Regions:
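N-terminal domain-start signal
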Residues: 1-329
Length: 329
């Protein structure tokens, strides 16, 4: 249950921040064996799951994320804002269940945990094509997606974009400065990633237009124009002013060197983490609470990467390279 004291919320978060796995521990885990890394995780209480099956690191990760989600829901002073960051999992699952309905079989994809809705409830919505229980803007987006399908325009990428747009519209409507900055940056980075992916596929600008989000600092029309001019070298310098301009410029420069959309994805994840950490020392806002949630999610990615690599007996140099790919720095 949410409570009213920001100071209490921040103090609880501060006490848990000490348990975040630091880079030195990550380094030691990656340099040992899978068994040694497992022992380190269990000894530090990661996942708090003493009955976990030996070497079932995924169970530890899910347990740790569940504990984190429970803490956030307990200490938040504004459930409306923290819920936005849980809704991302629901948006992912809506895409998955809709795809499964259209294909009529298991369409693949990994079910996302930690949303606000039970998976069965989301599945019922998709089967019934009735989305009223969702937040208004997400429900409207699902209705638009259903209209596309009903008209025979079954384009998975476009439908995914429509659902993402509904989620972003819901977040931007919060009116909170931190949440707005976070999702504006998400929108801009995701649009640049879409541009890079379409370039790799040799798609035309009409195709790109259908996959761009609105709500960021960069006008989608400017992205299409840059795409038409083959993303000239001057594009990064011509980005509109905004608090993420330097981050976006750096990401585009890295992409220009590698030609790999993954460079933009890494830049996005790192930029969003830095944005989230800006309010780490606040004592009267929701920023430290959300920042901790995002840090724990990043930590889970690191643990998963290391344990998977060690189980597959990959060398330390390979793990180090994959860590660089994850962090991008």
């Amino acid at each position: 249950m949410p409570q009213n004291s920001a100071i209490y919320a921040v103090s609880r978060i501060r006490s848990r921040e000490r348990s975040l796995i630091d880079r030195e521990t990550v380094k030691r885990m990656s340099e040992g064996t899978a068994e040694e890394a497992w022992r380190m995780l269990t000894e530090m209480g990661y996942g708090a799951k003493p009955d976990a099956e030996y070497m079932d690191s995924e169970a530890l990760i899910e347990s740790e994320l569940e504990r984190t989600n429970a803490l956030i829901k307990e200490v938040t002073t504004d459930e409306r804002l923290t819920d936005i960051f849980f809704l991302g999992a629901d948006a992912t699952n809506l895409k998955l269940f809709l795809k499964r309905r259209l294909i009529g079989a298991d369409a693949g994809g990994i079910y996302a945990h930690g949303g606000l809705y039970e998976s069965k409830e989301l599945m019922r919505m998709v089967q019934a094509k009735a989305y009223k229980p969702l937040p208004e803007k997400m429900a409207a987006a699902m209705d638009r997606a259903e209209a596309e399908i009903a008209a025979g325009r079954i384009d998975p990428a476009r439908i995914s974009t429509i659902i993402d747009q509904g989620y972003i519209d819901h977040a931007l409507a919060s009116g909170n400065a931190f949440v707005t900055a976070y999702f504006k940056a998400t929108c801009d980075f995701d649009n640049l990633i879409a541009m890079a992916r379409m370039k790799a596929l040799g798609a035309d600008e009409k195709r790109l237009e259908t996959l761009l989000l609105t709500g960021g600092v960069i006008d989608p029309k400017a992205i299409v124009k840059a795409y038409q001019s083959h993303m000239g070298e001057g594009y990064a310098k011509g980005l509109p002013a905004g608090e993420m301009k330097a981050e976006l410029q750096k990401a585009l420069e890295e992409y220009a060197q590698s030609g790999d959309a993954a460079a933009l994805e890494r830049a996005r994840d790192n930029a969003l983490m830095r944005l989230a950490s800006r309010g780490k020392n606040d004592i009267d806002t929701i920023a430290p609470v959300i920042g901790f949630l995002l840090a724990k999610r990043q930590e889970a990615k690191v643990v998963r990467l290391i344990m998977t690599a060690l189980r597959n007996r990959l060398g330390a140099d390979v793990i180090a390279e994959r860590m660089r790919m994850l962090y991008g720095e």
